[in-house]
Curated annotation (Swiss-Prot):
InterPro entries: AceGlu_kinase-like_sf, Asp/Glu/Uridylate_kinase, Uridylate_kinase, Uridylate_kinase_bac
Reaction equation(s) it catalyzes: UMP + ATP = UDP + ADP
GO cellular component entries: cytoplasm
Annotated binding of ATP, by residue: 12-15, 55, 59, 163, 169, 172
The UniProt record lists the keyword Kinase: yes
Pfam families listed in its UniProt record: AA_kinase (PF00696)
Protein name: Uridylate kinase
GO biological process per UniProt: 'de novo' CTP biosynthetic process; UDP biosynthetic process
HAMAP family (alphabetical): PyrH_B
Region (Involved in allosteric activation by GTP), start-end ranges: 20-25
Gene Ontology terms for molecular function: ATP binding; UMP kinase activity
Record function comment: Catalyzes the reversible phosphorylation of UMP to UDP.
Lineage: Bacteria, Bacillati, Bacillota, Bacilli, Lactobacillales
C-alpha cells in the first residue's frame, strides 16, 4: 500500500451532510454510509478526529435574528453538534471502530469531557475521537472548533468534506458555468480573496498553525482515502502552495 500523505487528520463535516436528501434532521442510512468511508480509512492505520456541525438540527444566528438571546441560541447549537456526534459514534462502533466522543461542555453521562492528553492517547490506541459542543463558548463556529482542535492535536490536515462541492472556485459554479476551480491556494490568498472555505477566525488559526486544508466532494465514494493518500482531488490550501489559477 502507498504511504499516506497525512497520518493524523481532522475531518470536518457539516451537519447537513448527515441529513441526506431531506436537508434537515438526521438520516441514519446517510450517516452509516459516511461512517463506512471513515472506517475504511481508519483500517489503514490513519489517526482520525471528527468535528461535525449542527446545522441540520439548529442554527444559532437565524434564531438570534428572530429574537432569541444569541448566547442561548449558540448553546442550543452545541447540543445539536453533540447529537450528531453521538449518532456518528454509534454508526462507527457498529462497524467495529472504537470511537470516543469528547464534548467542550461537561456531559459526563453521555460523553467524555474534552481533554487534549486523553484525546492523544485515544489516537495512539487506534480510536477515532469526535469533538462535539464546539469550543464550549458562544459566537464561535464549528469551523473554528475544527481549526482549534486540529492545532491542539497537531493534525497534519483538516479535510473539509463538502456536499456535492468538489473544491474551491472563484465564483459559485452552480450559478456561473465559467467559474474556475483552484487546485492549490495559500491561506493568505483565501483570506485576501474572501473565499468562504471557513470563517475568518478559522482560516487565520489554520494559517498561523501551518495546517493544510483540503476541500473535496464527500459524495464521491473513496474520496476521503484518496485525499489522505495524496491523490490530487479538490483544492489544497496551505502556507506553501502556489496559486495556480
Amino acid at each position: 500500500m502507498a504511504e499516506p500523505k497525512y497520518k493524523r487528520v481532522l475531518i470536518k463535516l457539516s451537519g447537513e451532510a448527515l441529513a441526506g436528501e431531506k436537508g434537515v434532521g438526521i438520516d441514519l442510512p446517510t450517516v452509516q454510509a459516511i461512517a463506512k468511508e471513515i472506517a475504511e480509512v481508519a483500517d489503514s492505520g490513519i489517526q482520525i478526529a471528527l468535528v461535525i456541525g449542527g446545522g441540520n438540527l439548529w442554527r444559532g444566528e437565524p434564531a438570534a435574528e428572530a429574537g432569541m438571546d444569541r448566547v442561548q441560541a449558540d448553546y442550543t447549537g452545541m447540543l445539536g453538534t453533540t447529537m450528531n456526534a453521538l449518532v456518528m459514534a454509534d454508526s462507527l462502533k457498529q462497524l467495529g471502530v472504537d470511537t470516543r466522543v469528547q464534548t467542550a461542555i461537561d456531559m459526563k453521562s453521555v460523553a467524555e469531557p474534552y481533554i487534549r492528553g486523553r484525546a492523544l492517547r485515544h489516537f495512539e490506541k487506534g480510536r477515532i475521537v469526535i469533538f462535539a459542543a464546539g469550543i464550549g463558548s458562544p459566537y464561535f463556529s464549528t469551523d473554528t472548533t475544527a481549526a482549534l482542535r486540529a492545532a491542539e492535536i497537531e493534525s497534519d490536515a483538516i479535510l473539509m468534506a463538502k456536499n456535492g462541492v468538489d473544491g474551491v472556485y472563484n465564483d459559485d459554479p452552480r450559478k456561473n458555468a465559467d467559474a474556475v476551480k483552484f487546485d492549490k491556494l495559500t491561506h493568505v490568498e483565501v483570506i485576501k480573496r474572501g473565499l468562504k472555505i471557513m470563517d475568518a477566525t478559522a482560516s487565520t488559526l489554520s494559517m498561523d498553525n501551518d495546517i493544510d486544508l483540503v476541500v473535496f466532494n464527500m459524495n464521491e465514494p473513496g474520496n476521503i482515502k484518496r485525499v489522505i493518500f495524496g491523490e490530487q482531488i479538490g483544492t489544497t490550501v496551505s502556507n506553501k502552495a502556489e496559486l495556480r489559477k
